[in-house]
């Protein structure tokens, strides 16, 4: 009976692992299209910008006995290669730099989140919000 249970367990684990590796349940870390809001305090408008950002699932591990060992570092989906594009906001006050730069993800990877260059927080309630009126019909890439 134990041999039959062991064989059944082996069969379930081997089939489940093969299926999971071919068809991930969640999309893996990759560049996706996104719309960002670009505005400055001394400029009267907000412009939406189409760009690519990094998003998706990164495999992580957690220790079973957390009190006994140090926690494992957790990874996030972050930029591997990135370039910065710029747009110029219209109607800014004199002396205010009207240029706003935004990231364009060329490739992504799973790695540690560096707070100096990335927003390491979770999902935002309102990712596209503007304090100033939104300029209609202008989308930049």
UniProtKB/Swiss-Prot annotation:
Pfam families hit by this protein: Cys_knot
GO molecular function, one term: hormone activity
Signal sequence segment: 1-20
Gene3D superfamilies registered for this protein in UniProt: Cystine-knot cytokines
GO BP term, example: G protein-coupled receptor signaling pathway
S-S bonds: 29-77, 43-92, 46-130, 54-108, 58-110, 113-120
InterPro entries membership: Cystine-knot_cytokine (IPR029034), Glyco_hormone_CN (IPR006208), Gonadotropin_bsu (IPR001545), Gonadotropin_bsu_CS (IPR018245)
UniProt cross-references to PROSITE patterns, sorted A to Z: GLYCO_HORMONE_BETA_1, GLYCO_HORMONE_BETA_2
Glycan-modified residues: 33, 50
Family: Belongs to the glycoprotein hormones subunit beta family.
Protein name (Swiss-Prot/TrEMBL): Lutropin subunit beta
Organism: Macaca fascicularis (Crab-eating macaque)
Gene name per UniProt: LHB
